[in-house]
């Protein structure tokens, strides 16, 4: 792949030296297709030819088979999801290094190379908490990202800033707040999970949350981890929520022209 990239660069440079750079697109695309053909061949020999369909078995809570059917990726999406994933969801970020109430775009941070840059509304943690509670109360889980390694106790499956008393252990004060930790790359969005539950007290305030991780059922409790609300405030960075759970004043912010941030911005650079 890198060899092919160099070949394309050399061809582009050569076309410029001949004064024909504007006519080089077709030739460059031809080289790109040749390179990708070789890449596809290598991957197929090593991993197998990508299947055009797959078999999926649905089971109930007692592991009893309900149905087994064949799908293509598109037919599976149409049957089990069939939602407007492009226009119905909003990314909400808590980045204290940037002004709240503004919309930001991260250059080249995308799900796929030729897709769209990630765009998010930057909000105080209190506003994000409101949206998350509303969504979970309606039994709707959310994409969620955080700095998962901080104050994590794997044995207890608990994320809690009170898990470890580093100040007493080392006799050193740790005074950086969330903003300073992001600015110095001491903290950032490092891992994504699914936010699936919240516990609220008699006043409707969240005191703990639950996420489902992607590390398998042997990690955490059946694959799930609990975090305190204090940890949520300090180390949670973003959620993606449906518009129906987001207040109108936040949705109005999407009318702004996004402020473009570089791909090496501290908020995204450390990400897995």
Where are these regions (language model features)?
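Residue-level marker of positions within ordered structural domains that often coincide
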Residues: 1, 6, 137, 149, ...
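Catalytic nucleophile-His microenvironment captured as a short glycine-rich beta-strand/loop
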Residues: 1, 183-216
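Core regions of eukaryotic protease modules
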Residues: 4-137, 148
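Glycine-centered flexibility motif
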Residues: 4-6, 11, 48, 157, ...
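Generic recognition of cysteine residues
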Residues: 46, 143-146, 224
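Helix N-terminus capping/helix-initiation residues
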Residues: 72, 124, 177, 228, ...
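Long, positively charged binding patches that form subdomain-scale interaction surfaces
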Residues: 112-193
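Conserved catalytic-core surface of thiol
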Residues: 201-272
